[in-house]
Structure formats: structure tokens, C-alpha cells
């Protein structure tokens, strides 16, 4: 659920998912994490092409260019078209099983692992620290 008036282009935190998320339903943990961080959810073109999310959520050259304080890229390969839309982000955390993925090599921070385990663990730790 987005904070009123906050858009993909203006949010200080964006949690995006790519093909690695696997399905529309599998975006639920990303939605939860974005909510805990008062951010919004974005996605890659592969996700909109698969019909998992609306084009309005797409980050990239043919979507929205973003410049959040924190960009968390989950299961995104980091094709140049996506990178063009995300590269102005101040801090990028890539979560991916592929240590050689473009987004991983360009991100300031990376967790090499399964987003389906990592994202819920991050959310659980945030809830623990903030009693949410």
C-alpha cells in the first residue's frame, strides 16, 4: 500500500522485483518489505511483459527513471535498459542467486542468495528491531 502522494519516481525507497521473483503472487514479500520501509514496489520489464505487474511499476528506460535513497533489486538481472532507469539511486542493494548478474556487479551492496529467503529475513529483522 503506497503512502499518499508517493510515486515510483518520488519514493525514497524502492523495492523492485525481476523475473527471479517467479510470479505475481510471489511479490507479496516485496510488498511487505516496501511497506516496512515506507517505500514502493517496482519491477523490471520482464515482469510487466509476463503480466505480473502493471507498466506503471516498471523501472527502466521504457518505464520510470528513479533516484531513491535506497533501491533494493530482487531477482533482477540488470539489463542496460533497467540500469538506465535505476542508476541514479543513491544506494543499491542487489539480492540475486547469480553473483555475476549485471545488477550485482554494479550495486554498492549485494546479497548472493535466494530472494525468497533473504527478503522475508530482512522484513523479520526490521519487525524485530522496531516491534512491528
Q: Which residue ranges define each predicted feature?
A:
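N-terminal glycine-rich FAD/FM-binding segment characteristic of electron-transfer flavoproteins
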Residues: 1-132
Amino acid at each position: 500500500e503506497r503512502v499518499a502522494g508517493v510515486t515510483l519516481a518520488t519514493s525514497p525507497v524502492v523495492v523492485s522485483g525481476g523475473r527471479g521473483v517467479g510470479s505475481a503472487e510471489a511479490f507479496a514479500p516485496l510488498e511487505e518489505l516496501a511497506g516496512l520501509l515506507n517505500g514502493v514496489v517496482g519491477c523490471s520489464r520482464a515482469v510487466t511483459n509476463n503480466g505480473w505487474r502493471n507498466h506503471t511499476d516498471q523501472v527502466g528506460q521504457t518505464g520510470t527513471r528513479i533516484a531513491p535513497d535506497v533501491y533494493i533489486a530482487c531477482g533482477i538481472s540488470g539489463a542496460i535498459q533497467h540500469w538506465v532507469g535505476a542508476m541514479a539511486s543513491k544506494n543499491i542493494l542487489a539480492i540475486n542467486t547469480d553473483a555475476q548478474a549485471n545488477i550485482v556487479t554494479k550495486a554498492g551492496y549485494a546479497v548472493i542468495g535466494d530472494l525468497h529467503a533473504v527478503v522475508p529475513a530482512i522484513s523479520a529483522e526490521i519487525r524485530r528491531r522496531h516491534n512491528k
